[in-house]
């Protein structure tokens, strides 16, 4: 055998082995189903070096707090037209295509929305479930809450998203009732909420700490959200029946979005826990 033919044989063998190794250890295109499993996490204090929280846009982590929208680094005042996202990197198997089973999930978090004492402020934040590769939509500041593109915001079939919105400014698609100028709502593929309730933000003292609990029951298919302000005697709740299989992909990520527009406020998440079982 000549030297050149031996080298060719060695090269071909190397390519074969490399391809075999790659086929064994390459990442799958999507997570593998695991029926009967439970996924949970609990974050008591946010860490800017955490590998599990992915922030986009203007969202940042500082002093243990997840700040969804931006403030001026010198004055600390909130900035106009700020948009941000924060998602947990763990994929959530929200329903199973083979069996048709739906997951139950529950989440709770503490938050502060600071209006700086202004009667006019905006625009709010959301807790959402969306596709694994969901990104910040273009032009999603203001009333679109960092979650919807203005062109498709009212077309439910275009948005595989379910969210609980904490809306602090009334837009044209929001409830007309003065009692719901600030409100919480359930969004199913659209910024036009399918169910809303009063959120007493404007009667709260500055920097009031809110506690939110969101649950989904796979049997009743009821999505429920409750907000309480301990020690202040203010609470609210909203619910809606929705089959998540008709809206969401099989695998989702969970997280928060927020936005300011011409009007401003701050949106801070203090802690967060989540659990899902399929």
From Swiss-Prot:
Per the entry, induction is: Accumulates in roots during colonization by arbuscular mycorrhizal (AM) fungi (e.g. Glomus intraradices).
The residues forming a coiled coil are none
Q: Name one GO molecular function term.
A: carbohydrate binding
The lineage is:
Eukaryota, Viridiplantae, Streptophyta, Embryophyta, Tracheophyta
* Key words of the record: Glycoprotein, Lectin, Signal
The protein, known as: Lectin 6
Alphabetized InterPro entries for the sequence: ConA-like_dom_sf, L-lectin, Lectin_LegA_CS, Legume_lectin_dom, Leguminous_Lectin
Question: May I ask which residue range the UniProt record assigns to the signal sequence?
Answer: 1-23
| Species this protein is from | Medicago truncatula
